[in-house]
Amino acid sequence: MNLLIQTLTAIAACTVLATRASAQSTVVPINNEPAPKLIVEPPLPGPLAGGVVFIQYRVENLRILPVGGPAARNVSPRVGHLHLTVDDLPWAWADYGQSDTIILVGMPRGQHKVLIEVVDAEGNVFTKQTVTFHSPGKEIQP
């Protein structure tokens, strides 16, 4: 059992070190940074069945921080945030959180879509993805 624990600990440590080795430095400015990448998972089925939407995501090559304006364009590694639009509504909201999960509650019953945009500090879009799902939520009466 002791050997198993040591082996698992070594594997976990190597995984963490390998992940950090490819991470961007926050000390030295990076020239020619790779483009930001957005990885989005489908909503978690368990909470969705209960009417709560959990959309997990990951952003690479960009730090999500609550900063804005033209001066932020010169920050390295690159900074930005998310713009989220639900069901093509004419408005969106900015997400500066670092939870890596979008949570929506109270969605009415039916098919929905969420547009997730990775933007720079001035709102210019780097990349985007749309997630579609069916909510079993309450039926809305007109």
What are the roles of these predicted feature ranges?
Residues 58-74:
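Short amphipathic, basic-aromatic surface patches that mediate peripheral association
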Residues 92-98:
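Short beta-strand segments within Ig-like beta-sandwich modules, predominantly Fibronectin type-III
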Residues 25-53, 140-142:
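Short, compositionally biased P/S/T/A/G/V-rich stretches that sit at domain boundaries
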Residues 82-84:
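Short beta-strand elements bearing conserved aromatic residues within extracellular beta-rich modules
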Residues 92, 120-128:
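Short acidic/polar inter-strand loop motif in beta-rich domains
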Residues 104-110:
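Surface-exposed, short loops/turns at beta-strand junctions within beta-sandwich domains
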Residues 132-138:
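Short beta-strand edge segments in extracellular beta-sheet folds
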